[in-house]
């Protein structure tokens, strides 16, 4: 046999002359960047062309509208995601209707305008302005508002006018119906969101949400439809316990050492402080992050899509860098009076809920993004998986470690240290792997992902398995780099 382990050149060749093969095991230096693949759950509309529970690669908002129906939850989510992140490989998996009915509520318009102006209505965060002339009645404005709604097909609702059945001929109702049925088909309706917007004197507006409670669709078929493809990040619009439990089980299996197709889910819950706090302490998921928003002008699924778009892009660039101050482009913050106070946000961060703040330009930005993991199996406080950066960094370290071994030693022989073999032989020993891991740690350290090389080197243990001589066991303890989040100082001044 040759001293060199050839891959394709046989040792029993007699035909002249030259035989040259290529080996790419040493071609790559460093670690190739992992693909930023994202999966988005969401409901399609009645005019969807895409089959339910089957992932579809989406590259534009118009493609999403054609696949899932214009104004559907999933089409709006995909458009919001792509507006914030055009680098990611976005896949969408549609669900059909949930339980309940399509009724959203009624907008009541009445009275007579005493001045010229504009009636500015916001439905699901979309602005609908109607010109108002002095003397116009609420009933006339209802017709104009419905025309504006019908002219804005990206709205998640349809509208019809219902005239007053009583004696008030200035009054009419605008009846709103959702384009999909489920717990998230309810929408926010308000007037005059921005400064300077006022309802003309004499016009009376009101909104009455539909009674009853709808339910989300079951995502079990969609989870089965995910297959074995790895999705690094998942946009999860549903926050009901059965669906979150299904997703948690799937993510934990993918996170395990056999599957290694780890992913991380992002969701948003809109509600009161009490609702959000109660929800947070009811969960304990290290692979799910939830941001809480009170008084949200837009549907929660749009915030979830944008939050995941921003976070996934930033963490793909540097998994260890904190996400604080990153803006959520296009998302409308709650009114000032609806925003959580400092003490409320601090408490929510102990309840497993991520927080946001609003900068002076009126833009929503991430304040701190955490996982929903709070306690260990004994119920004691456990911050080990608190930060999303920990999950993202661990995911990258495992990916780069696995890639280094599969790239450099794809089909090597295994021998004990001290074995004498030719330099060109495809043989690996514990000391060879240990040297490779130390070199890899230095790459991690240079990238700002880990620290304390000396301790890592001292504690690194590489040995052949005593029961399986084809197996190499490694015990290593990388010290993950931390994030600069808190600065505390005491100024002892002198007069």
UniProtKB/Swiss-Prot annotation:
Protein name as it appears in the record: Tail sheath protein
Loss of function: phenotype: No tail is synthesized.
Keywords: Host cytoplasm, Late protein, Viral contractile tail ejection system, Viral genome ejection through host cell envelope, Viral penetration into host cytoplasm, Viral tail protein, Viral tail sheath protein, Virion, Virus entry into host cell
Described function: Polymerizes as an extended helical structure around the baseplate-tail tube complex. During ejection, the sheath shifts to a contracted form, thereby making the inner tail tube protrude through the host cell envelope.
Family indicated by similarity: Belongs to the myoviridae tail sheath protein family.
Gene giving rise to this polypeptide: L
Biological process annotations from GO: symbiont genome ejection through host cell envelope, contractile tail mechanism
Record note on quaternary structure: Homomultimer.
GO cellular component labels: host cell cytoplasm; virus tail, sheath
Domain of life: Viruses
